[in-house]
């Protein structure tokens, strides 16, 4: 059975631009990167995290003050991969705006709420899901015990991050994340995961004058 993600990527459209040196072709994602737009699409894993972190660092080097937009449609994935993206978002100087389109579940929801305060958005039909980390281990009993201790520490750290970005109390976060907890865009706003639900893009000053 073919991988839907690979199939989609093989169909990425090209954009042709006219420059003073003639025509130049970009794939659509490279063209959007020029506009400081990065996509997190699909499961969060090491390969994706490396690409997202590289794009964040590149855009910081290009302009350390101009906002970066992160568009998220992800079911979540590997915690350490997500934390690599999270730490890079906090590390770089430009503010990072986040927007959920489709879904932001598990690590996707953490990256959504990690955007700059006042710049975290969701589209009206987006779904957000939060929960505690999960894992399965095998081996010697002592190793399983150590893995269990580590995932408990990881759970505590993730809870602290949600507390920091949502403004909710630790007990509320712990209770909410105890099981899969699904939210509409408006519910995510009320909970503090996002700052606003966007129904349409506002006109710019230039567009209004035109």
Swiss-Prot record:
Protein name according to UniProt: ATP-dependent Clp protease proteolytic subunit
Organism domain of life: Bacteria
GO biological process per UniProt: protein quality control for misfolded or incompletely synthesized proteins
Annotated GO MF terms: ATP-dependent peptidase activity; ATPase binding; serine-type endopeptidase activity
Catalytic reactions on record: Hydrolysis of proteins to small peptides in the presence of ATP and magnesium. alpha-casein is the usual test substrate. In the absence of ATP, only oligopeptides shorter than five residues are hydrolyzed (such as succinyl-Leu-Tyr-|-NHMec, and Leu-Tyr-Leu-|-Tyr-Trp, in which cleavage of the -Tyr-|-Leu- and -Tyr-|-Trp bonds also occurs)
Function of the protein: Cleaves peptides in various proteins in a process that requires ATP hydrolysis. Has a chymotrypsin-like activity. Plays a major role in the degradation of misfolded proteins.
Recorded family membership: Belongs to the peptidase S14 family.
Location of the protein in the cell: Cytoplasm
Main location, first listed in the record: cytoplasm
EC number, as in UniProt: 3.4.21.92
Active site, UniProt feature: 106 (nucleophile), 131
HAMAP family xref list: ClpP
Subunit structure: Fourteen ClpP subunits assemble into 2 heptameric rings which stack back to back to give a disk-like structure with a central cavity, resembling the structure of eukaryotic proteasomes.
Keyword S-adenosyl-L-methionine: no
Annotated Gene Ontology cellular component terms: cytoplasm; endopeptidase Clp complex
Transmembrane segments: none
Assigned keywords, A-Z: Cytoplasm, Hydrolase, Protease, Serine protease
């Amino acid at each position: 059975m073919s991988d839907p993600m690979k199939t989609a990527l093989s169909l990425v459209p090209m954009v042709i631009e006219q420059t003073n040196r003639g025509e130049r072709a970009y794939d659509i994602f490279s063209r959007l990167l020029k506009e400081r737009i990065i996509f997190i699409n699909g499961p969060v894993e090491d390969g994706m995290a490396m690409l997202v972190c590289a794009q964040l660092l590149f855009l910081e080097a290009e302009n350390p003050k101009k906002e970066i937009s992160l568009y998220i449609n992800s079911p979540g994935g590997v915690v350490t991969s997500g934390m690599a993206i999270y730490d890079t978002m906090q590390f770089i100087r430009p503010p990072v705006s986040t927007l959920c389109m489709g879904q932001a579940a598990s690590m996707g929801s953490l990256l959504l709420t990690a955007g700059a305060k006042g710049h975290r958005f969701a589209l009206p039909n987006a779904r957000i899901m939060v929960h505690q980390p999960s894992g399965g281990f095998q081996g010697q009993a002592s190793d399983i015990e150590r893995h269990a201790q580590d995932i408990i520490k990881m759970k505590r750290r993730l809870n602290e991050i949600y507390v920091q970005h949502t403004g909710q109390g630790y007990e509320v976060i712990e209770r909410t994340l105890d099981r899969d907890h699904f939210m509409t865009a408006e519910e995510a706003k009320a909970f503090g995961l996002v700052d606003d639900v966007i129904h349409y893009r506002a006109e710019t000053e230039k567009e209004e004058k035109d």
